């Protein structure tokens, strides 16, 4: 498993989350003595793929270094309902102040990882890989991209800066698939270039370009199979094929069995269902 995002990014998003919750202080936690010690346990209330340890830890590092966290599972691990995920020891005030912020990160990122894992499991036995998209929660892209990796998926481009994805409006503005890919290669010779196509005719045109990957946008299953056949018969540069658009769990297996290399699914980061975790004092 790669390291979770960038340490600076983790510190920044956690700091913002604490600030929006805490502001001038935790009025309720002040009811408890300043030096009252506590032991707390975080329990999963449903099966999940765990993700978010670094953000959870950073919350308490910023609030109070005296709070220690002992983990019983790693990011990417499958956890069962009622499993104890971690144990905290330290001042009760600080644990209570950080509880909601820390759990928010753990619940959201585990939700993304769990959703990804459920889709990855559907395509087991095929060579198709599941990709995320840029449809992420604002300010949390690197965190969610990491969660996708924890769930067994792959990252598409991180942003507009690290790869070129030529879509329909770009093609219309430039004039053609061929012209758009050629312009992209001249501009960025060492960057991955992907081009979106909406028909088999556009796919034929794209196969003759220097694109690295071709996105099949809203293709029917029959056209996907035809597209894979066209790619496999092509004697030039071998481009990977990515299916995109209107993909869900019910349609995913059939799409993977057409032979496409990737399926990109925005819902895994856009439609996040948080995993239910609770924290209880021992």
Predicted regions and their residues:
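Short hydrophobic alpha-helical segments of the AMP-binding
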Residues: 231, 235
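Short secondary-structure boundary segments
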Residues: 218, 245, 267
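Acidic/glycine-rich phosphate/pyrophosphate-binding loops and surrounding catalytic core
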Residues: 1-209, 213, 225-230, 240-242, ...
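Active-site loop ensemble at the mouth of alpha/beta enzyme cores that anchors a bound cofactor
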Residues: 278-282
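Short, structured secondary-structure boundary patches
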Residues: 217, 236-237, 241
């Amino acid at each position: 498993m790669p390291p979770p995002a960038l340490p600076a990014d983790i510190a920044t998003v956690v700091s913002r989350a604490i600030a929006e919750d805490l502001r001038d202080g935790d009025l309720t936690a002040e009811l408890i003595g300043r030096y009252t010690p506590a032991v707390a346990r975080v329990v999963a209330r449903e099966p999940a793929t765990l993700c978010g340890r670094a953000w959870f830890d950073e919350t308490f590092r910023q609030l109070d270094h005296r709070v220690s966290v002992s983990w019983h599972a790693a990011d990417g691990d499958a956890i069962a309902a009622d499993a104890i995920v971690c144990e905290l020891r330290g001042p009760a005030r600080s644990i209570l102040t950080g509880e909601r912020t820390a759990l928010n990160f753990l619940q959201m990122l585990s939700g993304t990882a769990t959703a990804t894992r459920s889709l990855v499991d559907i395509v087991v036995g095929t060579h198709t890989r599941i990709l995320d998209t840029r449809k992420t929660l604002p300010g949390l892209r690197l965190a969610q991209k990491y969660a996708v990796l924890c769930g067994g998926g792959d990252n598409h481009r991180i942003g507009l800066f690290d790869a070129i994805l030529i879509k329909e409006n770009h093609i219309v503005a430039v004039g053609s698939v061929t012209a758009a890919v050629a312009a992209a290669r001249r501009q960025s010779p060492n960057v991955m270039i992907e081009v979106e196509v909406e028909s088999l005719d556009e796919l034929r045109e794209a196969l003759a370009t220097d694109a690295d990957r071709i996105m099949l946008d809203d293709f029917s299953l029959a056209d996907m199979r035809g597209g894979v056949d066209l790619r496999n018969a092509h004697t030039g540069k071998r481009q990977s094929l990515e299916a995109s658009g209107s993909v869900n769990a019910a349609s995913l297996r059939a799409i993977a069995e057409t032979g496409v290399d990737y399926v990109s699914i925005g819902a895994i980061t856009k439609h996040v269902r948080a995993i239910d975790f609770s924290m209880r004092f021992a």
